[in-house]
Design a protein with these regions (language model features):
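N-terminal signal peptide c-region/cleavage motif recognized by signal peptidases
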Residues: 15-17
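Charge-biased low-complexity segments
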Residues: 19-147
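Sec-dependent signal peptide recognition
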Residues: 2-8
Length: 147
């Protein structure tokens, strides 16, 4: 009896280990400026897409967050507020963490000592086939209303 239960557990573990290894998740985060849409005083120093938070990927959470914040004279995001976070509040929490890590640089020397109010949207998308799939899904998602 013990041998048959042990054998069944071993077969189950071996058959499912291949499935777990083959499951890939590709994440993408798209950043869209809402306000202002042009004539920026500050721009992100590193314009790469933010990394998809691993906790969100593990949970399969996708959605969007609209964030409002100030960029200080020193180029740091301050007064960060979650305007909308769909479908879960956790997207706003992770979006705040992303914003706090960004460094901002003035678009011109005359703008260096001026603060700026910004509103942006972050779209979090995942796919199981490729990075391109998740990027395409995110481009489509940015066309939808967040909330």
């Amino acid at each position: 009896m013990k041998c048959s239960i042990l054998s069944a557990l071993v077969i189950f573990a071996v058959s499912n280990s291949g499935f777990a290894k083959s499951l890939n998740v590709y994440g993408d985060v798209q950043v869209t400026d809402i306000q202002p849409t042009s004539s920026f005083i500050w721009e992100r120093e590193n314009k790469k897409s933010p990394l998809y938070p691993i906790e969100l990927a593990r949970s399969g959470i996708v959605g969007c967050a609209v964030m409002s914040f100030d960029i200080s004279e020193s180029g740091k995001a301050e007064n960060i507020e979650v305007v909308k976070s769909v479908p879960q509040k956790s997207l706003g929490k992770y979006s705040s963490q992303i914003l706090k890590k960004w460094n901002w640089i003035p678009t011109s020397a005359t703008n260096a000592m001026t603060s700026e109010k910004r509103t942006i949207r972050l779209d979090f998308c995942i796919g199981d086939e490729s990075t391109e799939q998740s990027q395409n899904a995110c481009k489509q998602q940015t066309q939808l209303v967040c909330g």
